[in-house]
Amino acid sequence: MKTLLLTLVLVTIVCLDLGYTLKCNKLVPLFYKTCPAGKNLCYKMYMVATPKVPVKRGCIDVYPKSSLLVKYVCCNTDRCN
C-alpha cells in the first residue's frame, strides 16, 4: 500500500507543473522555449512594412513600445505568439 501511494505521489509530481511556466514560440513556431521566472509574456516582433513575417519571437517581462518601423504583439498564454 505504501508503495502504491509513493508511486502516485511521484507520478503527480512528474506530471504536474509545480509552479506555472509559460511556453513561447521561437522564430520557427514548430519550436518553443519555456520562459524563465519573471518573463510572463510571449511576444512577436515584426517590421511594419511586412506584418506577415515575424522577425523575432520569445519571452519578455514587459510590453515593449512599438515604433514607426517595428511592431510588437504580446500575449500571456502558452504558445500564443
UniProtKB/Swiss-Prot annotation:
GO terms for cellular component: extracellular region; membrane; other organism cell membrane. It comes from the Eukaryota. CDD domains: TFP_snake_toxin. Residues 1-21 form the signal peptide. The keyword Secreted applies. Keywords: Cardiotoxin, Cytolysis, Disulfide bond, Membrane, Secreted, Signal, Target cell membrane, Target membrane, Toxin. Expressed by the venom gland. GO terms for molecular function: toxin activity. Monomer in solution; Homodimer and oligomer in the presence of negatively charged lipids forming a pore with a size ranging between 20 and 30 Angstroms. Belongs to the three-finger toxin family. Short-chain subfamily. Type IA cytotoxin sub-subfamily. This is Cytotoxin 2c. It comes from Naja sputatrix (Malayan spitting cobra).
